[in-house]
Amino acid sequence: MEKTTRRLPIVERDEWLLPAEQELNRRYERYTDKINAIEQAAGSIVDYANGYRYFGWQRDELLDGWWLREWLPGAHDVYVFGDFNNWQRTEIRMQRDAHGVWSAFFPEAMYRDRLRHGSLYKLHVHGDNGWKDRIPAYATRVVQDEATKNYTAQFWAPEPFDWQGDAFDASKNGSLMIYEAHVGMAQEKEGVGTYREFTEKILPIIKKDGYNAVQLMAIAEHPYYGSFGYHVSSFFAPASRCGTPEELKELVRRAHELGLAVIMDLVHAHYVRNLNEGINELDGTDHHYSLPGKAGYQPYWDSKLFDYGKDEVQHFLLSNVKYWLDEFHFDGYRFDGVTSMIYHHHGYVDFDCRERFFDEGVNRDALTYLTLANRLVHDFRPAAVTIAEDVSGMPGMCIPIADGGIGFDYRLGMAIPDFWIKELKEVPDEEWNIWEMWDVMTNRLPEVKTVAYAESHDQALVGDKTLAFRLMDKEMYYHMDRASESIVIDRGMALHKMIRLMTISTGGQAYLNFMGNEFGHPEGIDFPREGNGWSYAHARRQWSLAKNGFLRYSWLGDFDKAMIKLVKRYKVLEDSYAWNLAMDECNKTMVFSHGNLLFVFNWHPTASIPDYELPVQAPGKYVPVLSTDERRFGGQQRQAMDAEHFSFPARDGDNTERPHIRIYNTSRTATVYLRKK
């Protein structure tokens, strides 16, 4: 039994939370009440979250047949039909129990030659909204008819997948270096890429680039490809346009063999409104998986909201959390849309005071659910990671549950890409404020682990721009060949490298990159839609650009590899906060260190300063080990990479004596030096 009257550690550690102590205690009590009830009923939350082993199709060896079960409490009548009964809607009636669960049994002797692996089926549901042909919520395979475009559930009962030998442990990989990817648009061809193609062609690229985790978007089935996977229709079915469930499992297994953790982009913030494909009004009511009326609608996303306070909905979602870890061996989740989940206003307010995090605008049921989800993930797979996409800064998001927190391992550093966009859009280079930059990069509590990123898929979507395109725009079409000369391209490439190095070295304890951005992939993402003639031209990745030895893209890609290698070798992310040594606003130069590494960033567009004197953390010999200005990365090589800089004692402005070195501090350059004793 989890109950306590002690002061929660989250409050003990942060006096700013003292006025909210009563509400934090209530939150913790809501969680403990729920987890205690779960443990009394099922023994543990791991054993509780087994909906996928009861609902849907389940083999009964004792009775020699198959059960089909679905929770439809508001339905008046339910039938199952498919190719196994010539699509006769009202032939096979399901039976209802006292809890609103409808079931039908299919004896092997009767259906052996009719109900086979791959058979198609649907439910015929009579509810308050009339008679509807529907796809079950627990369907594990859903396919689209190419002619009619209709989706249908598929009876999926292959031979068990062979996971033998897959004992991958993500915790042994060190700090997370995440490669964010979308399977469908990962290929160069115009069309939808497959799990198999991703396994064979893209995983080796990710491994070679030095990343140790791949974060997969759009895994759960979604009817509209252009939704980027965020309007989910079937929560237990992998997107069939990319292949079979077994091919997705093979992708995960191969990633593990390469030493790559696989993180799933999990969408539990909302679900698609569609009746034909999704779970909306599945039992005929508007309050099946959501609250009734406006309370169950997300107006900003035109989608439906889950009722996180309903036991059956919590069970459905928690079962879904366990399902992907258990059946597909995913190594954790990025929980999408957490801000929308935890506030009734979905975060569309100014978080200008403490009360915003504790008033009636907070969805307490969602907070309880997320806490339970984190408990489940870490109880079932202790090495798994959970990442929260929360822009509000909700206190306790990454604090352990036992301390009064919500239990996420990481939060996304969403203020970082916003800062870079604002800077590039609104501020001339010579007016960049290096103190503001430093504050944004390091603005996090010590115990809150942050995933730093300069850009993700959000910045690549149509209507926005990638960093590369924001920096170089149409010049990329004409001057990315190595023989061409362009001050726009020179500036863009220099800043592209500096921004990424600044982000990874100061922004957090993990790092994320969206596929292709490491080599400056041009243009944004535009999925096929009526407005572009259903074209796939901008829903793909042009890997050939980075492989073409006559183009500059390979220089950016080579820099990214070198940057990742250095950060991993010297455990920069494990060091958490950088040690700020100097901030020279006049020359736009900042100096900081991580262990024996010294980082010097000169953001000035023109000022290159010979014999520039700067403080270092410890005496010794400093040698450059990485520079954005190296010729191998498309730079001008204005510094000698074999130079040695010996420290000498000197006094700072406050008359404190400390070791210094002198360097050639070149404009728009970031250089990393290694201290040798």
Set out the residue ranges of the language-model regions:
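Non-transmembrane alpha-helical segments in soluble domains
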Residues: L203, K207, V252, V321-L325, ...
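Short, flexible loop/turn elements at secondary-structure junctions
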Residues: L72-G74, F84, A98, E108-M110, ...
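Substrate-binding/active-site clefts of carbohydrate-active enzymes
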Residues: V143, P160-L176, H182-V362, F646-P649, ...
